[in-house]
Amino acid sequence: MKGKLFIALMLSASFSASAADSVHWGYEGDGDPAHWGKLSPDFSLCETGKNQSPINIRQALNAQHDPLQLAFQSGTQQIINNGHTIQVNVGPGNTLLLDNETFTLQQFHFHAPSENEIDGKQFPLEGHFVYKNADGALTVIALMFQEGAANLPLATAWQQIPARVDQVEDVRTPIAIQALLPTSLNYYRFSGSLTTPPCSEGIRWLVLENPVTASAEQINQFSSVMHHANNRPIQPLNGRIIIH
C-alpha cells in the first residue's frame, strides 16, 4: 500500500503524468506541439501564453544572483516510462533554497534533443529536475548533456529503464542525483512554463550553463526507447529578461 501511495503522490507532481494525460498529446501527428493548444481548453496556454518554454538563451543580462543551494539525500526512487519521457520519482530530502523559499525535488526526466538552447546551440539531451515549494510553485533546473565520455549516473538510470509504456519500477540501484550535475553550477534564470501540456506559466527556470557528457550510445539508448524526439520547439521570448 505504501508503494502505491508513493507512486500516486509522485505522479501527481509530474509534468507529464498529470490531468493532461486524459487528452492524447505527444510529439508527432495531430497531437504534436503545434496542435497542443487546440486539443483541450485546459491546454490553451500552449497556444496563447506569452511566457512559454523552452527558449533560446541569448543576450542574457549579467547580474549578481545567489548561487544554487542544493541538498541531497539518498532514498526511495522509482523509474517510469510514461510514453512521453523517462522519469525518476524521488523520495523526500532533496532540496533547493531559492528566493528564501525551500523547494523539494519531486522528479527528474529527460528530453532528446534538448528543449532549451544556449546561443542557438541545441544539445542532444536535456535533463529537467522538477522542484516544488509548500505552495505548489515549481522551479526547474535544466541540465544539458553533450556527446562525450559515458556518464556513470546516467548509466545507472538507463540500466533500469522500463521497456513498456506506463511501466513503473522500483530503482534497485539508486541514481546519484548530485553526481549527475556539473561541478560549476552557474546558471541562467528566466520565467517560463511547463514544456508539456497544460503549459502552465509562472515556472522559475534555472538552466545550468555548463553541460555534462553522455556517450553516443547512452543518447541513442534513450531515443530508441522513446521511438521519437520528445522536445517542444523553441518559444518566443516576448521581451523576457534572462539573468546570468
Label the model's feature ranges.
Residues 5-10:
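Sec-dependent signal peptide hydrophobic core
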Residues 13-17:
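N-terminal signal peptide c-region/cleavage motif recognized by signal peptidases
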Residues 3-4, 18-244:
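Alpha-carbonic anhydrase
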